[in-house]
Structures are given as C-alpha cells and as structure tokens.
Design a protein with these regions (language model features):
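Membrane-embedded alpha-helical segments of integral membrane proteins
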Residues: 1-44
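Short, flexible coil/linker elements and helix-boundary hinge sites characteristic
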Residues: 34, 95-98, 152
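Cytoplasmic juxtamembrane regions at transmembrane-helix boundaries
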Residues: 41-54, 132-138
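Internal/C-terminal transmembrane anchor helices
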Residues: 49-83
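Cytosolic juxtamembrane regulatory segments of multi-pass membrane proteins
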Residues: 52-53, 97-107
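Alpha-helical transmembrane signal-anchor/signal-peptide segments
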Residues: 76-98
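Extracytosolic and intramembrane catalytic regions of membrane-associated proteins
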Residues: 102-156
Length: 156
C-alpha cells in the first residue's frame, strides 16, 4: 500500500564516499608529486618499473575518485527516491496537500505540510512505521510531542 522509504542506505553511501576520498586524495597527491619528480629525472633514472608504479598509483587514485562519485550519485538518487516516496505516503495516509521535506537523517525526516482545511504545520517529524506507513508527530504551543491526530491532521 505504501512505497518503500529508506533513508539509511543513502547515508551509508555517503560514508563510503568519505572513506574512498580519505584514501584517494593522499594517493593522488602523492602520485602527482612523484610524476613531477619522475619527469625531471634524467633519462637513465626513468625506469620502466618506476613508470609502472606511477601508473598503478595514479590509476588507483582515479578509480577511487570515480567510485566515490558513483557512490555520491547513488546516494543522491536514493535520497531523492525516498523523499518522493515519503511525500507520496504522507499524502496517501493523511488529508494533506503541499508536503515538503525540509530535513532528514537516517531514521526520520522533518516535513512542512498544509492540511486540506488550509492549516499549515511546520517542522513535523515523519517516521515510518510498519510497511512504510508514515507517522507524523509535532509540537504545538510548547507541548511535548503530539501525534498527527492530536494536531488536527485527519487520516484519509
């Protein structure tokens, strides 16, 4: 009935991006300076083994950067899909219009929405329950967390 919402996987991909860049950047910087030294050496010192090592180091650095970029795009696509699915799920379950996700992390998202009655709610926490059913909670007039029904957001 509800579309799958997964905010954990994009965060994992972002962690992979960070790890890949931690290895790729120093490796690439080292390869750059080694290439400069290699080119400045006399012809007798420019051996095939050194050239091969530099190519391997440069290729590995470039490969890691390409994997980091691919992981970043995968995270972006996954986040966008989960955001669209969450908006669709909220609009399916609750009598609301104009749902906008303003913030997110691995377990919840902050949403702003307008009910069918025209009441605007800002900074509601949207969780996913069983089978990706959205659960909205928020505060009103300094109260503790209130459910969607207590905030006047009707179910469909």
């Amino acid at each position: 009935m509800y579309l799958p919402v997964d905010f954990h996987t994009p965060l994992l991909y972002l962690a992979v991006v960070g790890i890949l860049l931690v290895f790729a950047l120093p490796l690439g910087i080292s390869a750059f300076f080694r290439w400069r030294t290699f080119r400045a050496d006399a012809n007798g010192l420019q051996t095939y083994a050194r050239r091969r090592d530099l190519r391997i180091q440069s290729g590995l650095s470039i490969g890691l950067v390409v994997l980091a970029i691919a992981s970043a795009f995968t995270a972006l696509i996954g986040w966008q899909k989960s955001t669209n699915n969450l908006v669709s799920n909220v609009e399916t379950r609750y009598a609301v219009t104009d749902v906008r996700v303003t913030n997110w992390n691995g377990t919840w998202a902050q949403v702003d929405l307008v009910t069918d009655d025209g009441v605007k709610h800002d900074d509601l926490s949207a969780y996913t329950g069983d089978f990706y059913a959205p659960i909205l909670q928020g505060t009103m007039a300094g109260n503790s967390q209130l459910s969607a029904e207590e905030l006047g957001i009707k179910l469909r």
